[in-house]
Amino acid sequence: MQFRPSIALVLSIVGILSLEISWTDGCTCFMETRREKCQRSTFGFIGYPYFAGRTNIGGMEYNRFCFFIVRIHKGLSVVFGEPCVYSSVSSAACGTGFYSGSLSIVNGYIESGVKQVNLCGWNERWRSVPSFVKFMFLTQPNWCYA
């Protein structure tokens, strides 16, 4: 009879450890406001995603998202070229995505010459942004600058 509780104990410990391991492998972002995320970014724009595909850059798989850009709010020279951004395929590496045809705000950074976005940046559907944040963002030219 004492054998069964020890098996249950071992199984519960293994279960807890596996859960802990899976949490440490996931994406971890700092708790930041939308403004702080925007200030931390190298470039930013509002646009409609019209193309999504996969590509390989330097041996890494990325999702590629191209946009019809409506408004550039940061990094004009960066955004003015190819209207596409790249995000890791893996959500464990903080990969993100966009809804095709849905107006989105996109903020990212340059790494190894590639425009990258991730879950830790301010990247979301424009309609999900609270009205007050939209008002501050659209009326204060330096809102995204520290």
UniProtKB/Swiss-Prot annotation:
Reported tissue expression: Prismatic layer of shell (at protein level). Expressed primarily in the mantle with highest level in the mantle edge and lower level in the mantle pallium.
Primary localization: secreted
Subcellular location: Secreted
Keywords: Secreted, Signal
Signal sequence, renumbered to the chain: 1-26
GO cellular component: extracellular region
InterPro entries: TIMP-like_OB-fold
Membrane spanning stretches: none
Protein name: Uncharacterized shell protein 1
Species whose genome carries this gene: Margaritifera margaritifera
